[in-house]
């Protein structure tokens, strides 16, 4: 991969962004983006988010936290890069030789001091390795040993740190635990300070390995794989060949402490929460945030690593949480917050916290993932949840039968589930998702079929309460045996296809059935192998990722399992996956035991031993008769509701909380957006008016919300327009005036504002030329941002982007509108009774995420309107504004060739006769089978593809406004 300068990368983006599926992902000009002089910072990080979903995921979680920590100091800088959202965008970068780069600084990855990512599960590592290759950086740290100072330090962190074996061949450093700075407890900034010191000494480039040695000795939560060696031995495990097992570990660096220990923030009130992030243009949530109120879990479920390695549970105080929510609203202009699901049920004052957020911040809270024991414990808490804005709730039932739930320590009976659903329906919830873990060790067909009996009881409750529209969904996912849990000694259970029978039963009961994507055999095999990976297993996984040479957007290649088998054999695992998936014994060493998670192996083994005894002494057919009570036979594992947490209800005095009526339901919002009218050839009146009407009027919306939303919309417009064009000065000024103006009104269900602007006479042509490409997206952003929390559009709904009324000559109107309509990102539907634009409807170049763009005529006034589907969000908007003169020429030629316009400016021949098989250019008769290849050229008449292409080339200049050339 050749070196690419920031100027080269910027130039390529300007020429090619309009061809990307998600161009806004690479802009880096959003409000909240970090921009610092490159030469004035001492440590530069590139934080790469490898999520295979919308890049908003990486904007609000650990990558955003890391960026915030670095950018909080003047001498540190963190840029960002996101995995392209589609394979086509990734291929575009790869074919053009564009490396991974900071989207704000436009510097390539190799220019940074550190390249970091957060890994929560295995597939994300596959994506990160692809980004490393795209950056032109050798994949394995051994291949970087000859000249490590020329490459950034590759750092991995996240939840996968407990079993980092699959990352060891690649990562220079693995950050164990939590990164936030805490007084007296170090953090990421302390590591950065050391890197700055090394750079000042000149050793960061000249003696990079020496710098790594100094970091490894000082910070016990930084694990450098090059300084630890893993030993293996072969044992007879009853497999066809001797099994390769871990025999021990050795430190290769004097003064380095082993085992390594994960870092934990002791008091969440001591660290600053995430209160601001870049406002992503392409994020449909537009500023919605995540609210962290706690960390850790006191449930101690035997399958879940979260409950074992993140303890003790810690929580943020009510006052700090409310302060966090207010800061997010102030900075981001959105009151939509989603508390992290595992955190809220654990909070000792969850009822008071929820009430405080609703009362003081008026947030639209999605507190949908709940524990059944908490849900059943307090009717008032259930009602407060219903006020929070969601119409559905998710229950973690976990096991398919009471026996399986007792095995994992959940202790939930079918009666508990039915009671929770009954309470929820009476409180107003209408959607219930029950999350199940299947394929647990010891699970039998009888356990699986027990869930059908539960489904029948739920259907009966729905009928008894007279709520036929209540939706139930049973969601199943196979067990992933995680490291550092009591389950780590079990052999992974093969997928049990008994669930197919369950699906048929649920269909008859009117209950939705869903199996998670991890159930795909190749994917679960990869996930499970990464959880059990030692150093050499990681080498095999890296080989496979390198062979595949691609990223993962949800699925895993079909031949991944076969490739893993072959790679394991090459690295000495003669039985392939069987060596890794075999049952473990007490004396076995796991591939991660050089890391201390705070939970001893003796404690985990004792729980495992009791689980084995429990399975041997029970069976699904007689279990409910053998044991009574909610805890069943799981006496060996303390249950959450049996542990005193001070006051389980969360409210010290149990006072009756009074809330405003704030019940939110999904509804459609009608938007009447804007109108632009050219009065004459010297002036234009622009009336920008956004009005949102929510049919359900019992939603209380504060005046402050509308003010934040409108101000943010105008800020977005100003920032975006200023970056994109240097000639639309007055349009930028317009956005600035909206930031300052006071001509707006609001109510509980609407907000509107208006502004009239009269440009000087000489600027009218320029204004018309740029109105389509610049003003339209600003108006859409305005409408998108003032959407009230809780209001939503149907998937097939659209919103009117803008109307343009021009009292001018038809030739001038046609020239202006054709320029905009020549985009490959829209479809044009010409609807008019005028022969000038053709009769009837003609759809050309449809995109499934764009609705309609149509033109109507009354006398000499033409109205152009675009409808953009809710599915698209601001995607299509940015596709329309990325235009430069070179883009207009490139887009106009194929658009004309396909017959985007019919007729001619002078009147022409009107709608072409598609049944005539002769080309008017060359006179050649076109075979009947190719009639659909006939085209209408701008001069009128029908042409074959070759002649139409030549005709298109002759009119490109006419379609390009002179002010843009």
Spell out what each predicted region is.
Residues 298-304, 584-676:
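Cysteine-cluster motifs in flexible loop/terminal segments that predominantly coordinate metals
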Residues 636-644, 930-941:
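Short linker/helix segments within small regulatory modules
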Residues 59, 282-319, 643, 647-664, ...:
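Canonical Radical SAM [4Fe-4S] cluster-binding loop centered on the CxxxCxxC motif
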Residues 45-54, 114, 123-124, 323-481:
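Conserved SAM/AdoMet-binding glycine-rich loop
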Residues 1-168, 203, 731-740, 805-807:
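Acidic, glycine-rich segments characteristic of secretory precursors and extracytoplasmic regions
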